[in-house]
């Protein structure tokens, strides 16, 4: 069974502790894809939810001291119940405090994957690239950044940009799909982190397969959305992207995938 069919069959509960800007978009994107999102940030909820979860997303976009403690508590409980956790270290290259939080979560808690743009992942491994807040300029050595992070942390890495790189156990795969409209809609990268959290726990020991499917499904849905009427307009693209996530099939992935 393919990873996409498995996701739709299992409808994994994904606990999304994410930033305030993208919660609605993230929840709707996961529902469209076939997962079951829970956006609770109430500490007393964590154990009750995580014991049944198929994935956990920690996105540090709207960072506070209280949220840092929430991330730590969630990751501790996720490890107790063997729930795969994905970290999205938003803008960790933009300031020392964010870098400190990201380093803490990576070094002291169990993570199943890290997803970030080239600037964010590069900052985690000390590679200097052009970065501006949550955005990252076009980077030529995205594969090297992914491999460096995978080697340093021994965690599967997804680095996104004009081309995406996935590094698992020293192997790197490049995904050339995607839409130029994605950066024009706030939250597309953050939703990808949640999609990764939805796929990563579906098949034990098949992290590379799961991550490839997650990124391909996501990026090809973006291509489909852009080609629809008025898909070149951000508002229409946002709606059509959710529609495409709902409608995308394994046949679409097989036909349109561009992987190296």
UniProtKB/Swiss-Prot annotation:
This protein's UniProt keywords: ATP-binding, Kinase, Magnesium, Metal-binding, Nucleotide-binding, Thiamine biosynthesis, Transferase
Pathway info: Cofactor biosynthesis; thiamine diphosphate biosynthesis; 4-methyl-5-(2-phosphoethyl)-thiazole from 5-(2-hydroxyethyl)-4-methylthiazole: step 1/1
Cofactor: Mg(2+)
GO molecular function, one term: magnesium ion binding
Binding site for ATP: 115, 160
Residues that hold substrate according to the record: 39, 187
Cleaved signal peptide residues: none
Pfam families: HK
Catalysed reactions, as listed in the record: 5-(2-hydroxyethyl)-4-methylthiazole + ATP = 4-methyl-5-(2-phosphooxyethyl)-thiazole + ADP + H(+)
Gene Ontology biological-process entries: thiamine biosynthetic process; thiamine diphosphate biosynthetic process
EC annotation from Swiss-Prot or TrEMBL: 2.7.1.50
Entry similarity comment: Belongs to the Thz kinase family.
Role of this protein: Catalyzes the phosphorylation of the hydroxyl group of 4-methyl-5-beta-hydroxyethylthiazole (THZ).
Name by which UniProt lists this protein: Hydroxyethylthiazole kinase 1
Species in which this protein is naturally found: Streptococcus pneumoniae serotype 4 (strain ATCC BAA-334 / TIGR4)
Phylogenetic classification of the source organism: Bacteria, Bacillati, Bacillota, Bacilli, Lactobacillales
